[in-house]
Amino acid sequence: MHQGAPSWGRRWFVVWALLGLTLGVLVASAAPTSPGTPGVAAATQAANGGPATPAPPPLGAAPTGDPKPKKNKKPKNPTPPRPAGDNATVAAGHATLREHLRDIKAENTDANFYVCPPPTGATVVQFEQPRRCPTRPEGQNYTEGIAVVFKENIAPYKFKATMYYKDVTVSQVWFGHRYSQFMGIFEDRAPVPFEEVIDKINAKGVCRSTAKYVRNNLETTAFHRDDHETDMELKPANAATRTSRGWHTTDLKYNPSRVEAFHRYGTTVNCIVEEVDARSVYPYDEFVLATGDFVYMSPFYGYREGSHTEHTTYAADRFKQVDGFYARDLTTKARATAPTTRNLLTTPKFTVAWDWVPKRPSVCTMTKWQEVDEMLRSEYGGSFRFSSDAISTTFTTNLTEYPLSRVDLGDCIGKDARDAMDRIFARRYNATHIKVGQPQYYQANGGFLIAYQPLLSNTLAELYVREHLREQSRKPPNPTPPPPGASANASVERIKTTSSIEFARLQFTYNHIQRHVNDMLGRVAIAWCELQNHELTLWNEARKLNPNAIASVTVGRRVSARMLGDVMAVSTCVPVAADNVIVQNSMRISSRPGACYSRPLVSFRYEDQGPLVEGQLGENNELRLTRDAIEPCTVGHRRYFTFGGGYVYFEEYAYSHQLSRADITTVSTFIDLNITMLEDHEFVPLEVYTRHEIKDSGLLDYTEVQRRNQLHDLRFADIDTVIHADANAAMFAGLGAFFEGMGDLGRAVGKVVMGIVGGVVSAVSGVSSFMSNPFGALAVGLLVLAGLAAAFFAFRYVMRLQSNPMKALYPLTTKELKNPTNPDASGEGEEGGDFDEAKLAEAREMIRYMALVSAMERTEHKAKKKGTSALLSAKVTDMVMRKRRNTNYTQVPNKDGDADEDDL
C-alpha cells in the first residue's frame, strides 16, 4: 500500500526546491523578460485581470527540447506567443510540470474532464421513498429427533423341517457268461406313513423294510431284497452338511443273484430321514424345502388359534397335527426335554414334519434398515422433509402420520422402533434432551416407513410445555372418539420398498444446495435492501451539500445540479478530452496579495482546434467556467487535487509533483457481503438391500438345491463298494431256503451241508481262479507233461512185466544170473549143467499159492461189501483152501543150469 504523504527524503527535496524557486523569482524580477519564453505566468496574469492570453499547449504535445522533434510538421496545438513580461525563471523551474501531467494522463488514458453548466430548473428530480425489505425464506416447524427407518422385508421366513421318505430301486439284470448288463433301473420315492413316523422312527429309531405307496391310482408294495417285512435300524448318513443331518437304513443297492442267460430283478428299499431348511415368502401360502420340493400349504396352517384359515391345497387326511410331540435325536437316541406342536403332511413323494408356530409375530413384512441418531424434520408446503447428514438422505412424507394398523403383519415395527430409540436416547440424549410425546410414524416416498421420536433440549422444555398447554387449550374439550371398529375394519396393505436409494440421495443434495443458495440469496437481498434504505437517507442529506455528485451518481452520468427546495434541478455535463486540459502551476492571485485560489486553475478546449477557455478545476475532474473559488492564503498550505486518473500535489499554493491513485491509502465504504461458500460434503455408499439380502430373497436357493441333489448319493449310498455277480449264489439261496423250511434241525443240517458245499465250491473256484492265472496255467501244463511222461514209463514197465515178469520184478537178480561173480556157484553150475527140478517145482508151487492168497483176499473184501451170506461163503472157501495148504514140502536142491537162466 502506497502512502498518501511523501516520504521524508521527498519532503527535504521539496524544501530545497522551493528555496531555489524563491531565489529564482527574486533574480527574475530584476532581469528583463525575454519575449518568447514559455511559462505559466501569462495565464496567472490573465487570471488576475490582465489581458487574456492563449492557453499553453496540450499535455500531449512534445515538450521543448525533445531530442527527436518531428520536422516539417505543423504541431497539432501550436504554442501561442508569450508576453514579454513572463517570468522565464519560474517557467524554467517548473519545466517538468507538463511531463508529470503527461505521465498521469498516460497512466489513466480513460480519465475525462467535464464542463457542467449551471442548471436552470427545466429538469427536476426527486428520490424514491424507502422500500420494505423481504424476509429470509425459511422452513417452518424445524424439529430435531431420533429416527428409525424401516424397509420392506424381502427375506423369506426360514424354519427347520424333517423329510421322511423311502427310495425304492428295482433293477433288471441280464447275466452272461463273463459279464452282467443292466436292462433297466426303476427308481421311485414313497412317503412314510404317519404311524410309522411316530411309532417306529421317532419312538424306536427303526424303519420298516417295505414301502407302500400309490402309483397310477394303484397301491403297490415294495420289499427290500425281495424278502419279508422286517424292522431296519436307522444309521447316520455318511456325509453330513453344514445345515442339516440325515439317517438311512442301507448303503448298498440290492442286485439279483446270478443265473446265466436269464433276466433277474432285485428290489432295494432305503428308508431316509433328512433334516432340511424350509423357506416361505409373503403371503406365506406355500413353502419350499432345500431339496427343491414344493409344499403347497402355509407353514402356519394348523388346528390351533384360528390357523385353520391359512392356505392349503391338500386333503384333510393328508395332514396331522400332534400336540405334545417330543422329538428324538436318531443319532444319540436322546429325547427332547420340551414338547412342541408338530405338523405332519404326506405328499405323493414324501412326508414332511415341522414345528408349528403362530403367524404373529413370527413374520413381519417390514425390517429395520437404518438407525439415525440425528434426524431433522422440517415442513415445506404440504410435506415433511426428514434430512440426515449421517446417511446423506432426505425423505419426503405427508404431514399426516401413518397408522401401523394398516401395515399387514407389522407387529415388529413398534417394538423394534421403541427398543432402538430407547437405546440411542440413553446413550446420547439422556442428560441434555427430553422426549416429546410418543414415536410418530410416516410413510416416505420410495416405500420407507420412518419412526420418528421428537426431542427437545432441557433449556426449552419449560417453554415448550407452556406452548403445548396453550395449543391444547385451543382444541375442543371433548374430541369425538373414533368408531370402535374403525381400526379393525381398516384395510391392510404391504409397503413396497424400492431397491434404490438414489432418489433420496438426490433429494438430499437438492435440499442441501437449495437451503444454502436460498439462505445466501436471502441474506444478499436483505443486505441489499437495507443498504439502499440506509443510503437513501444519507443521499437526502448529502444532496444538500454536494448536489452535483449525488445527482451524477443517481442519474448514472455526469450532470450538474442544484437544490430547488425539496427537488434538484439538473443539467447535462459536456465531456472534454484529457489531452485538451492543462493545469497551471500557481494558485496565488498576484493582483491581490494575501488571496489565493482554493482550487487549481486550468485551461482547456472543447475541441482539438477550438479556442482556449480559462477555468478552474472542480471536484471529480469537473471544469468550472468561473474562477471564483478563492480563499485567504495560509502558511503550510498542502493540497491534493484529482486530476484525470491521479492526483496533483500543491504545496504553498505551487505545484510540487504528481501521484497515482495507488499512492494514496484507500478507505473502503462498501458493506461486506456475507456469502458463505458451499461446504464440501462427501456421500457415503448406502444400500437399501445388500447383495446377500437380494440373493436370499428368493423362495428357492438353487445353489443349495443342486448341492443337495448331487450330494444325495454320497450321503445315503455306498459308491465305493463293487458287488461281483456269483453264479453259485442261486444254488446257495435255494439250499438255504430249503433248509430254512425244515425247522431248527433243518437249519442245523443246512449249515453243515452249506459249509461242505461252500468248501467244494471254494475249492473249485480256487482251482478255476488258479487256472485263469497265467502262472497257474503254466504250472498245470508242466504237471500234465510230467504226468504224461510218468504214464509212458509206467506203460513200459507194465509191458515188461507182462513179457518177462521176473526180469521186471527182479532185474538185478536176473542180471547176476547172467554174469555170476561167485566162482563156486559158477563152477557148480558148470558142473551140474541143468536146473534142479525140485527147486523149480517148489518155486512154481509158491507162485500158485501167492495167486491163491490174492484171490482169497479179494473174495473176502467183496463179501464184506455184499453182506453176511457172502461173508460166510468166503469163510467156508477159506477153510477149504487151508486144508489144501497142509501138503508137506521138501527142500529142492538148488541146481540151476545155464539154460534155465536163459529162459528166465
Swiss-Prot record:
Sugar-modified residues: N87, N141, N398, N430, N489, N674
Modified residues (Phosphothreonine): T887
Region (Involved in fusion and/or binding to host membrane): 173-179, 258-265
Topology, Virion surface side: 31-774
Gene Ontology molecular-function annotations: identical protein binding
Disulphide-bonded residues: C116-C573, C133-C529, C207-C271, C364-C412, C596-C633
Compositional bias annotation for Pro residues: 476-485
Hydrophobic membrane proximal region: annotated segments: 719-772
Membrane topology type: Single-pass type I membrane protein
Segments carrying motif Golgi targeting: 849-852
Presence of keyword Transmembrane helix: yes
Residues of the signal peptide: 1-30
Database matches in Gene3D superfamilies: 1.20.5.1890, 2.30.29.100, 2.30.30.1230, 6.10.250.3280
Role noted for this protein: Envelope glycoprotein that forms spikes at the surface of virion envelope and binds to the host cell entry receptors MYH9/NMMHC-IIA and MYH10/NMMHC-IIB, promoting the virus entry into host cells. Essential for the initial attachment to heparan sulfate moieties of the host cell surface proteoglycans. Involved in fusion of viral and cellular membranes leading to virus entry into the host cell: following initial binding to its host cell entry receptors, membrane fusion is mediated by the fusion machinery composed at least of gB and the heterodimer gH/gL.
Family listed: Belongs to the herpesviridae glycoprotein B family.
Subunit and partners: Homotrimer; disulfide-linked. Interacts with host receptor MYH9/NMMHC-IIA. Interacts with host receptor MYH10/NMMHC-IIB. Binds to heparan sulfate proteoglycans. Interacts with gH/gL heterodimer. Interacts with the host coreceptor PILRA.
Name listed for the protein in its UniProt record: Envelope glycoprotein B
Organism: Human herpesvirus 1 (strain KOS) (HHV-1)
